[in-house]
C-alpha cells in the first residue's frame, strides 16, 4: 500500500497545504480584522472622546440654555417693569408738558405784567429823578439859606447874650444857671406801693437848649402841663464839670480885678449841689484836678485857676486868706478855729455888722495860703467837721450850709497911669464905683501895709475882694427823706433857712423897704452878696425824676425869683483910704 499510501500522503499534504493556505488566509484575515479592529478601536476611542466632548458641550450648552432661559425670564420681567416705568414716565412727561405749558403761559403773562410795571416804574423814576433834581436844587438853596439864617441866628444869640449880660451887669441881676443831674438808681426806690406802681423814675425835667428848661407836670388827677423856665445857662445831664466851671471861670478874673464874687449851689437834697461844688464823694475829700475831664467840682477847680491867674501877674500878687464856716441848726460854726491844743474843731461864732455896714463873723479864724494845694488842704479839713447824716434820699446828706471865703488883699494902683490900666479891663465901671448906697469892705485883718510914696498916712492903699463859695444844704420833704429825731430838727432848720433865703430874694425883687436878712443866720451872713455889690452866681441843681417833681418846681421858682433881683451894677473894691473916708462914725 505503498502506492495507496502515496496518494493519501499527497492528499494529506495537499490538504495540509490547502489548510495551511486557509490558515494563512484566515490569519491574514484575522490580521486584517485586527487591524481593522484596531482602527475601529481608535475610531471608537475618538468617537468616545467626541461623545465626551459632545456631552460636555451639551452640558455647557444646556447650562447656557438654562442661563439664557433665566436671562430671558428676567429680561421679560425687567422689560415688563420697564414698560411700566416707561408708561409712568410717559404719563409724567405728558403731565410735565401740560404744567410746563401752563407755567410758561403764566410766566409769559407775568412777564408782560412785569415789563409793563417796569416801564411804568421807569417812567415814574424819570419823573421822580426830575423832581429829585429839582428838590436837590431846592434843598441846596434851603441849606444855604438855613446856614445863613443859622449864622445870623447864632450872631444874634451872641449879641443878645452879650446885651443880656450887659443888662445883668447894669441891673446887678443875680445870674442863675440851672443844672439837671442824670437819673440815679435811688430815683426809682420807694416804700410807698402807690409810688412803686407809678412811673416815679420817669424823666420829667429836660434841657431844651442851653437856656431853657422844660418840665412836664404829669401829676395824678391833674392834666399834663408843660412848664418852661429860662435861665442864663442850662446844663443837661450829660454836660461835664469842666463845662460848668467854664462859665464860672470869668468871675475869677473879676475877683482879681477887685470885684466881690459869690458862687452858690441851691437845690433839694440829692440834686447834685455838693457834686457840682466839690466833686464826687470821697473819704479823702476833694483834690486838685489832674486834667480838665476830671469830675472835680467848682471849688478845687477855682482854687487851681485862681492861683494860676495870680502867677500870671506876680507884680501884683495878692495876699490870699481862707476862712470856712458852716451854718448848722441856725448856728454858725468856724471850721478852721483851733482849740487849746491847736487841734481844729468847730467853734460857734456870731454874725455882726461892722462899722462900714458890712456883715462879718466875729473872731473868725482865717489862714493865709500860698498855693491851691494848701487851700484844698484847709477845705478837706473843714469838710471833715461838716455835719452829715444819711437819709432815704441821700446816703451822705449834708446837714449844714458850707461857706468857703477866699479873701484877696491887693495893693491898689498908685498913679493915674495905673488907674487907667486897672480900669481898662472893665470900661465904665470906675464911674459906677463912685455911686453911693453900697456896702464896702475895709482892709481889717490884713497884714501891715507897705508904705506908698505920696501917701500922707504913710501906708499903702489896699483893696480887698472876696470870693465866697457856698454849698447850701438841700431842701427836704420829710415824708421822702424819712428823717427822725435830731435829723428831723436839722431838716426843719435847713428848710427854714432856705425859706428865709427865698423871702430875702422876694423882697429884693419887689424892692421892698425892709429886707428880712436877720430872719436867718444864713441870710444875715450872706447879706453882702445877696443885696450888696458882689457878682452873684446861683447854680440851681434839680432832679429830673417824676418822684421829685414838687421839689424841682420849687427850686425852679426860686431861680426865677433870684433872676428878678436888681441890685445895681457890681463895683470894684475901693482902696482902703477911700473906705476909711466912707465909714460911719462910731
Curated annotation (Swiss-Prot):
GO BP annotations, alphabetical order: establishment of spindle orientation; microtubule-based movement; negative regulation of mitotic centrosome separation; nucleus localization; protein homotetramerization
Q: Where is this region: Disordered?
A: 417-460, 564-586
A GO cellular component annotated for this chain's UniProt record is: cytoplasm
Q: Which residues does the UniProt record annotate as the domain Kinesin motor?
A: 173-565
Q: Which residues form a coiled coil?
A: 10-94
Please give the InterPro entries that the UniProt record associates with this protein.
Kinesin-like_fam, Kinesin_motor_CS, Kinesin_motor_dom, Kinesin_motor_dom_sf, P-loop_NTPase
Question: Where in or outside the cell is it found?
Answer: Cytoplasm, Cytoskeleton, Microtubule organizing center, Centrosome
Q: Which GO terms describe its molecular function?
A: ATP binding; microtubule binding; minus-end-directed microtubule motor activity
PROSITE patterns, per the entry: KINESIN_MOTOR_1, KINESIN_MOTOR_2
- Residues holding ATP: 267-274
| Pfam families assigned | Kinesin
Q: Tell me the keywords, alphabetical order.
A: ATP-binding, Coiled coil, Cytoplasm, Cytoskeleton, Microtubule, Motor protein, Nucleotide-binding
What is the role of this chain?
Answer: Minus-end microtubule-dependent motor protein. Acts as a negative regulator of centrosome separation required to prevent premature centrosome separation during interphase. Required to maintain a centered nucleus to ensure that the spindle is stably oriented at the onset of mitosis. May also act as a negative regulator of amino acid starvation-induced autophagy.
Q: How does it assemble?
A: Homotetramer.
Tell me its family: Belongs to the TRAFAC class myosin-kinesin ATPase superfamily. Kinesin family.
Name used for this protein in its record: Kinesin-like protein KIF25
**Native species of this protein?**
Macaca fascicularis (Crab-eating macaque)
Gene that encodes the chain: KIF25
Amino acid at each position: 500500500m505503498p502506492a495507496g499510501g502515496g496518494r493519501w500522503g499527497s492528499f494529506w499534504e495537499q490538504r495540509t497545504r490547502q489548510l495551511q493556505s486557509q490558515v494563512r488566509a484566515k490569519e491574514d484575515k484575522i490580521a486584517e480584522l485586527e487591524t481593522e479592529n484596531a482602527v475601529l478601536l481608535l475610531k471608537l476611542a475618538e468617537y468616545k472622546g467626541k461623545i465626551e466632548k459632545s456631552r460636555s458641550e451639551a452640558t455647557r450648552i444646556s447650562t447656557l440654555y438654562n442661563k439664557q432661559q433665566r436671562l430671558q425670564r428676567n429680561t421679560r420681567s425687567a422689560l415688563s417693569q420697564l414698560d411700566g416705568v416707561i408708561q409712568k414716565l410717559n404719563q409724567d412727561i405728558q403731565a410735565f408738558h401740560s404744567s410746563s405749558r401752563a407755567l410758561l403761559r403764566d410766566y409769559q403773562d407775568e412777564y408782560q405784567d412785569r415789563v409793563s410795571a417796569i416801564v411804568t416804574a421807569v417812567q415814574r423814576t424819570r419823573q421822580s429823578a426830575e423832581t429829585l433834581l429839582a428838590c436837590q436844587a431846592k434843598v441846596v438853596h434851603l441849606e444855604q439859606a438855613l446856614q445863613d439864617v443859622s449864622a445870623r441866628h447864632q450872631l444874634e444869640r451872641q449879641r443878645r447874650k452879650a446885651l443880656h449880660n450887659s443888662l445883668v451887669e447894669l441891673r446887678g441881676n443875680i445870674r442863675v444857671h440851672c443844672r439837671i443831674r442824670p437819673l440815679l438808681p435811688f430815683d426809682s426806690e420807694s416804700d410807698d406801693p402807690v409810688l412803686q406802681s407809678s412811673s416815679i423814675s420817669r424823666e420829667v425835667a429836660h434841657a431844651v437848649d442851653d437856656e431853657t428848661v422844660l418840665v412836664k407836670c404829669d401829676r395824678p388827677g391833674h392834666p399834663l402841663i408843660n412848664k418852661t423856665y429860662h435861665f442864663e445857662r442850662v446844663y443837661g445831664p450829660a454836660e461835664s464839670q469842666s463845662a460848668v466851671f467854664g462859665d464860672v471861670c470869668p468871675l475869677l478874673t473879676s475877683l482879681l480885678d477887685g470885684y466881690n464874687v459869690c458862687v452858690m449851689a441851691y437845690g433839694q437834697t440829692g440834686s447834685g449841689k455838693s457834686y457840682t461844688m466839690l466833686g464826687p464823694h470821697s473819704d479823702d475829700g476833694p483834690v486838685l484836678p489832674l486834667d480838665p475831664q476830671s469830675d472835680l467840682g467848682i471849688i478845687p477847680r477855682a482854687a487851681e485857676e485862681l492861683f494860676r491867674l495870680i502867677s500870671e501877674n506876680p507884680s501884683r500878687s495878692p495876699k490870699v486868706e481862707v476862712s470856712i464856716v458852716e451854718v448848722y441848726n441856725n448856728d454858725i460854726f468856724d471850721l478852721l478855729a483851733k482849740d487849746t491844743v491847736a487841734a481844729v474843731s468847730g467853734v460857734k461864732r456870731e454874725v455882726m455888722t461892722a462899722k462900714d455896714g458890712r456883715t462879718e463873723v466875729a473872731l473868725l479864724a482865717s489862714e493865709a495860703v500860698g498855693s491851691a494845694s494848701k487851700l484844698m488842704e484847709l477845705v478837706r479839713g473843714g469838710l471833715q467837721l461838716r455835719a452829715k447824716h444819711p437819709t432815704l434820699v441821700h446816703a451822705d446828706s449834708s446837714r449844714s450850709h458850707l461857706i468857703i471865703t477866699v479873701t484877696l488883699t491887693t495893693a491898689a494902683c498908685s498913679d493915674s497911669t495905673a488907674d487907667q490900666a486897672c480900669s481898662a479891663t472893665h470900661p465904665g465901671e470906675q464911674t459906677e464905683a463912685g455911686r453911693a448906697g453900697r456896702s464896702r469892705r475895709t482892709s481889717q485883718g490884713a497884714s501891715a501895709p507897705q508904705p506908698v510914696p505920696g501917701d500922707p498916712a504913710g501906708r499903702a492903699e489896699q483893696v480887698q475882694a472876696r470870693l465866697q463859695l457856698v454849698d447850701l444844704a438841700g431842701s427836704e420833704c420829710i415824708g421822702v427823706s424819712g428823717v427822725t429825731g435830731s435829723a428831723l430838727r436839722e431838716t426843719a432848720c435847713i428848710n427854714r433857712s432856705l425859706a428865709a433865703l427865698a423871702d430875702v430874694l422876694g423882697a429884693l425883687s419887689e424892692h421892698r423897704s425892709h429886707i428880712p436878712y436877720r430872719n436867718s443866720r444864713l441870710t444875715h451872713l450872706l447879706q453882702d452878696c445877696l443885696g450888696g455889690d458882689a457878682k452873684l452866681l446861683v447854680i440851681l441843681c434839680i432832679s429830673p425824676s417824676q418822684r421829685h417833681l414838687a421839689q424841682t418846681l420849687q427850686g425852679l421858682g426860686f431861680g426865677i425869683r433870684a433872676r428878678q433881683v436888681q441890685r445895681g451894677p457890681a463895683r470894684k473894691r475901693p482902696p482902703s483910704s477911700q473906705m476909711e473916708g466912707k465909714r460911719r462914725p462910731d
